[in-house]
Amino acid sequence: MINRRKTRPVYVGNVKIGDGAPIVVQSMTDTKTHDIEATLNQINRLAKAGCEIIRVAVPREEDALALQEIVKNSPIPVIGDIHFSPRIAFLSLESGIHGIRLNPGNINDKGKIKEILQECKKKNIAVRLGVNSGSLEERLLEKYGYPSAEALAESALYWSEFFESVGFTNFKVSIKGSDVLQNIKANKIFAEKTDIPLHIGITEAGPAGRGSIKSAVGIGILLYEGIGDTVRVSLTADPEEEIKVVYQILQALDLRRKGVEIVSCPTCGRIEVNLPEVVKKVEEKLEAVDKPLKVAIMGCVVNAIGEAKEADIGLACGNKSAILFKKGVPIKRVSEEEMVEELLNEIQRMDNE
């Protein structure tokens, strides 16, 4: 079992972050926020996929003015992503928004930040203090020569202390870069010095394939070491893909379970069925199942018996047929043509139990 870092609680709307709460899954819309209908449609799809907090870009006044309607109709808490403009921040705070993200790399006027924090405190609005390698303060770039892990951690600690010095504690921190090792080190430095909750992720990770791998490595290592209270996988892809990858990472570390986990062998010369096709069909059909189930689909008997004992249900394939098993007990033999349908029917019954 992973021993998670002890952190203080932060609330974004009704969602608790830190203090032992389950790791919260986040994403960000890719719509124009002032297009209220498109933004709400995407938020609803993401919420259905398992997103628990959503962030929206607020680059212009028209986006800030759209927030009230979005917040009112969103099924999950909404965070406004604010850069450069304190005025946009204040407009956003009037919308009833649940949280805002501030980047000290591009809003570093302490007077304005203090005013924003005071308004957040008055309205009970949470803040994410977001430090990013691509927008680090000039003084730290001059000190370290580049956005090193130490520079990122120093920025996060400096601004955290400033937030607390003006009496604001309802915030979490994110320290992100696209370099996995830099990201891990920066978050570890910060985590050792404070109990502030951390939002973790690899920013600008890239397209779905490469980005998922980078995210799994970077996020997975931090989570294994107990660091991270909320997480986003950032991909150049449909945001719904981000949600799938997040839950797969959390499931692999036994931190949260949602939906079906498929265990299948890599295939070899012993298999006598088209296992890749079987697995593909099963995976596609089970995307909508939310119940945590472990499904084993094995190509031969070598590991099938052992996996059957660990899985909720599965197939042990042989010569153009398979044994369907449930909780390690063989149920019946099915033909290659029937195996997918029989397995799916049994899983549907389990999902309804």
Swiss-Prot record:
UniProt KW 4Fe-4S keyword: yes
Pathway(s) annotated for this protein in UniProt: Isoprenoid biosynthesis; isopentenyl diphosphate biosynthesis via DXP pathway; isopentenyl diphosphate from 1-deoxy-D-xylulose 5-phosphate: step 5/6
Keywords: 4Fe-4S, Iron, Iron-sulfur, Isoprene biosynthesis, Metal-binding, Oxidoreductase
Binding positions for [4Fe-4S] cluster per the UniProt entry: 265, 268, 300, 307
Function: Converts 2C-methyl-D-erythritol 2,4-cyclodiphosphate (ME-2,4cPP) into 1-hydroxy-2-methyl-2-(E)-butenyl 4-diphosphate.
Family matches, as PANTHER family: 4-HYDROXY-3-METHYLBUT-2-EN-1-YL DIPHOSPHATE SYNTHASE (PTHR30454), 4-HYDROXY-3-METHYLBUT-2-EN-1-YL DIPHOSPHATE SYNTHASE (FERREDOXIN), CHLOROPLASTIC (PTHR30454:SF0)
Protein name in UniProt: 4-hydroxy-3-methylbut-2-en-1-yl diphosphate synthase (flavodoxin)
Gene Ontology molecular function, alphabetical: 4 iron, 4 sulfur cluster binding; 4-hydroxy-3-methylbut-2-en-1-yl diphosphate synthase activity (ferredoxin); 4-hydroxy-3-methylbut-2-enyl-diphosphate synthase activity (flavodoxin); iron ion binding
Catalytic activity: (2E)-4-hydroxy-3-methylbut-2-enyl diphosphate + oxidized [flavodoxin] + H2O + 2 H(+) = 2-C-methyl-D-erythritol 2,4-cyclic diphosphate + reduced [flavodoxin]
Parts forming coiled coils: none
Co-factor: note: Binds 1 [4Fe-4S] cluster.
Organism of derivation: Sulfurihydrogenibium sp. (strain YO3AOP1)
Family: Belongs to the IspG family.
Keyword hit for Amino-acid biosynthesis: no
Cofactor: [4Fe-4S] cluster
GO biological process: isopentenyl diphosphate biosynthetic process, methylerythritol 4-phosphate pathway; terpenoid biosynthetic process
EC number: 1.17.7.3
TM stretches of this protein: none
